[in-house]
């Protein structure tokens, strides 16, 4: 099968660029978007498509720094924004005593700014409060926090929230104790409203955290407004409108939100940011595809292999069993063949996404990649999609990533 342009379709342009770091890539992208607009392209005719929500959030932050009006399409990308993440974290803490990562994030965030020494003391106190826990030598903070979130048995898992409510003789500074008291008081006040309808509770949390006032000062409350609307209209499968149902949906959107929500960009004159999944059926004059690097796009297989992961539902029991690979032979050869079939299925799925991404631009497609980003120990290589785009465009070759 060969793809051909439609009859009468104007010529398009493909640009291919590569950068040493993700920061350099995003700086260039934001500068180029601004330049395109200055040359006459409306903001609404520009889109940035990414494979992952974390990249989407980084693009949003960089465009905002350049005063570019921008809209994130889809709830998954909103959840990592600095005005949304504390709301979701607070909602989880209100319902889950083992939401240790969220408690730690809130306490060390801009609002409470608990010091690392105080957090380490709190983590040790959390271990002390576990029934039957024997005293241990203090661990480095990173190991303390890792242990807090890694225990599989809830009955023996430490709870930072328990330690916040009962710090005992923990070596916490006076200022830290004062902040923890205000933190617990705020949570207690919010818990008194857990029986409210979920949208009202969400608004109450936003108000209590002072986020709406903060965004008013910055001149943009649109993302908060969109989050509130999403929380008011989420697909309530259980029909009880519970906070637990909302949080389960938000978790699913962030982790597996490939198509849980239909993309509906507004008509506002703003650059549209969305994951490739949500771009199906949409087109823009200019489309940017950043981070076409190995491990990003194509992404790694998140569906997993049920034969090696007991947490996954066996493929024969899934509702889409007829449309996915099945393990036909339980011998080693059969299991190896099944594993390879899963890899091929994942590759085909990523190829479909790449097709969607590459065909969203009416006139200009800008493809870029990077080698380094925070947290990497080895440089990323160029993805095969980047190489495919480079083959369509005469560009300066990207040097191989450094060893």
Predicted regions and their residues:
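Inter-lobe coupling/hinge region of RecA-like P-loop helicase motors
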Residues: 1-49, 103-104, 146, 158-171, ...
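Conserved helicase C-terminal RecA-like lobe
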Residues: 42-43, 53-68, 81, 88-364, ...
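Conserved beta-strand scaffold positions in the cores of enzyme catalytic domains, especially
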Residues: 13-16, 70-72, 273
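Glycine-rich loop motifs involved in handling phospho/adenylate chemistry
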Residues: 75-82
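Well-ordered alpha-helical segments embedded in enzymatic catalytic cores
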Residues: 25-35, 55, 86, 352-353
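Acidic, low-complexity intrinsically disordered tails
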Residues: 402-403
């Amino acid at each position: 099968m060969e793809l051909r342009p439609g009859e009468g379709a104007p010529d398009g342009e493909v640009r291919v660029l590569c950068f040493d770091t993700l920061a350099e890539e995003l700086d260039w992208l934001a500068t180029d978007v601004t330049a395109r607009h200055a040359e006459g392209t409306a903001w609404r005719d520009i889109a940035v498509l990414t494979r992952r929500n974390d990249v989407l959030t980084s693009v949003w932050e960089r465009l905002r720094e350049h005063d570019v009006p921008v809209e994130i399409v889809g709830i998954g990308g909103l959840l990592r924004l600095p005005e949304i993440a504390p709301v979701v974290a607070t909602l989880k803490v209100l319902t889950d005593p083992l939401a240790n990562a969220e408690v730690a994030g809130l306490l060390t965030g801009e609002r409470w700014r608990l010091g690392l020494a105080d957090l380490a003391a709190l983590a040790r106190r959390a271990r002390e409060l576990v029934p039957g826990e024997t005293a241990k030598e203090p661990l480095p903070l990173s190991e303390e926090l890792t242990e807090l979130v890694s225990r599989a048995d809830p009955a023996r898992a430490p709870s930072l929230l328990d330690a916040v409510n009962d710090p005992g003789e923990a070596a916490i500074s006076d200022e830290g104790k004062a902040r923890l008291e205000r933190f617990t008081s705020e949570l207690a006040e919010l818990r008194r409203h857990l029986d409210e309808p979920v949208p009202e509770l969400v608004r109450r949390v936003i108000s209590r955290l002072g986020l709406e006032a903060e965004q008013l000062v910055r001149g943009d409350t649109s993302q908060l407004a969109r989050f509130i609307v999403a929380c008011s209209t989420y697909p309530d499968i259980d029909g009880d409108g519970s906070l637990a149902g909302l949080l389960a949906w938000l978790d699913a959107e962030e982790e597996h939100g490939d198509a849980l929500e239909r993309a509906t960009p507004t008509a506002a004159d703003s650059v549209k940011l969305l994951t490739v999944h949500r771009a199906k059926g949409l087109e823009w004059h200019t489309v940017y595809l950043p981070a076409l690097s190995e491990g990003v796009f194509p992404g790694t297989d998140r569906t997993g292999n049920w034969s090696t992961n007991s947490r996954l539902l066996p493929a024969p029991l899934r509702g889409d069993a007829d449309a996915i690979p099945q393990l036909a032979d339980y011998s080693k050869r059969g299991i190896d063949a099944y594993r390879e079939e899963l890899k091929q299925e994942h590759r085909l799925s990523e190829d479909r996404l790449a097709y969607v991404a590459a065909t969203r631009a009416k006139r200009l497609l800008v493809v870029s990649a990077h080698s380094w980003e925070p947290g990497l120990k080895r440089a990323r290589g160029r993805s095969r999609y980047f190489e495919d785009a480079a083959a369509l465009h005469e560009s300066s070759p990207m040097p191989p990533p450094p060893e």
